Amino acid sequence: MATEHQPGTRYRETFARAAQDPAEFWLEQARTLDWHTPPTRGLDYDGQTSWKWFPDGQLNISYQALDRWVQAGRGEQPAVIWDSAMTDQQVTYTYAQMLDKVSRFAAALRAHGVGHGDRVLIYMPMIPEALIAMLAVARLGAIHVVTFGGFAPREVATRLDDAEAKAVIAANGGLEPSRTIRYLPNVAEAIELAEHKPQVVFIKQRPEVDDTIDAFNTEWLDFDEQLAAHEPVEAVPMAATDPLYLLHTSGTTSKPKAVIRDHGGYAAAAAWSLPNIYNVDAGEVMFVASDVGWVVGHTYIVYAPLVSGATTVVYEGKPVGTPDAGAFWRVVSDHGAKMIFSAPTAYRAIRAADPAGEHWQRYDMSALETVFSAGERLDEDTYHWLAKVTGKPVVDHWWQTETGWPIVANLRGLDPMPLKPGSPSVPVPGYRVSVVNPLGEPVGHGTEGNIVVELPLPPGAMVGLYGEPERFYSSYMAAFPGYYETGDTGYIDEDGYVFVLGRSDDVINVAGHRLSTGTLESVIAEHPTVAEAAVIGVADEIKGQKPVAYVVLTADADVDAEQLRAELVAKVRHDFGAVAAFRDVDIVSALPKTRSGKILRRTMRSIVEGEDVSAPATIDEPAVLDSFAQQATRWEA
């Protein structure tokens, strides 16, 4: 039976138009862009695994992001605000300034042999030059391959080889609260390890980092000198279907998958999503606390804001410790951001350090309209804490590296709808979402299953995996023909709201019962002294697997460990059921996570089951892995 939470008429009509005639719907949206050759066809689709959006159109996304706003008289509007808590700097770049820098650096790249279709690896921290590099590569029709700053040399080498990058653009280092991450040794070692050698290397030399080009390789080029030495060049018209970038997923396989995104479809999706999902328009300020090395940074720090004529805040700092748990609120206040978007792990860190939300009260937050969250499931306890402290709508939404922009969201610009804690709301127009059983058959409302999306995927989503068409099919389409397999489990309720319970590989089997660790974590995280929780399944002789919870306490927690265990066991039994057979709790100081905030559950499981473990390349703080290993109980089978 439907409830008062049903989505509104405007949403339903828009979704229906996008579902019934996706080619015409997206062709209409694409007319908001400034095309070199406007498309006459919205979509070519073979009915199986190949689709092309705007196949006869031509544009360049760098032109969309910069030139057209300068030509429209917005040249003096701020495009990028760099806010570095690490260097105590705030620097604003207008659209005209960004266009000049991007055009000059594109000329430098061209002078050193970079052109249409060449791959360029970018390895930089959260500095404006990262955006300049990305847009300059795109301007030439080359393909950028952004690799998260601070990745170990072997990970960088893997991406160098996979992309066969002609050039590398890097900085000499990144800044963390307790250390400097030296990039140049990593670049040098990565090139040595890689079978494929880049022809040219550009280095942005930051004065805060001691390492210099001369100490490593005198043939490497200075980023700033090269930019200054060249005259601006025009953007190269590109087929809408030409690749814009490769972005490697941090999957569980030994070889990361390189997602391909195109110019035209991505530009159209970015331009549509910003006003409709985030309610951000040209001239407004947005703060996305992520990194350009991840998909969130690509789409909502770089491309969507600039393609839409908005102002994007590039933040170099942490949610806590730079200098305190008010860091995000300070950034919002300083720059008048209309929205903030970060991962639940960041919000949980703020809550753990400032449970009463005292830092929020220190700042003028009147410009802020909405608090967005994505990257992992937003547990209800964190949701309610954020809503109470901020007094703003707290909007979860769900998407993936592969999709490039949200699959499920509460469309705050198109048609704001009631929020349901635990749900990122409804499928975004363009994404026809279903829940199916292992045989691919749709299941009823409220029934858990595999979340899938009907093909073809909309503009902005991946169009393939670089050099691996067979893997593209086997990874995403083989299991459920006609659908994209998201790899997540969940259900859709009677109002059409989607509830994402976790990765299908985050399901544990306890005595024949399949249990979602995400649901268990949500129940545990509701306890007032628990700041964060992770549940993993460990081997058990009787039940096959049993759930074990690892909890991080709030800063003001004062509780006996055995008392807490008893309370959590009782809570899970009451809220989830005895079927969980839950009775094991460990208190730890921190949970091992990737740099994008995802909990390393597989690594945790390996540690507690006594396996030899090396720190994954994606880990944020290697020291946390050591402390977890010391604090966690062993569960060897």
Positions of predicted regions on the chain:
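Conserved AMP-binding/adenylate-forming core of the ANL superfamily
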Residues: S62-Y63, V80-L135, A152-A157, A215, ...
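Conserved pre-ATP/AMP-binding loop-to-beta segment of ANL
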Residues: E76-P78, V201-K204, D214-H248, K255, ...
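Structural core segment of the AMP-binding/adenylate-forming
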Residues: L135, R139-E225, G336, A343-P344
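AMP-binding/adenylate-forming catalytic core of the ANL superfamily
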Residues: F148-G173, V187, S333, I340, ...
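AMP-binding/adenylate-forming catalytic domain of the ANL superfamily
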Residues: Q199, I203, I542, H574-I599, ...
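Conserved AMP-binding/adenylation subdomain of ANL enzymes
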Residues: A267-V285, V295-M339, A352-E358
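Gly/Ser/Thr-rich phosphate-binding loop
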Residues: A310, K338-S342, R351-P418, R432, ...
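Conserved ATP/PPi-binding loop(s) of AMP-dependent carboxylate-activating enzymes
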Residues: V426-G430, E441-Y476, L515, D612-V613
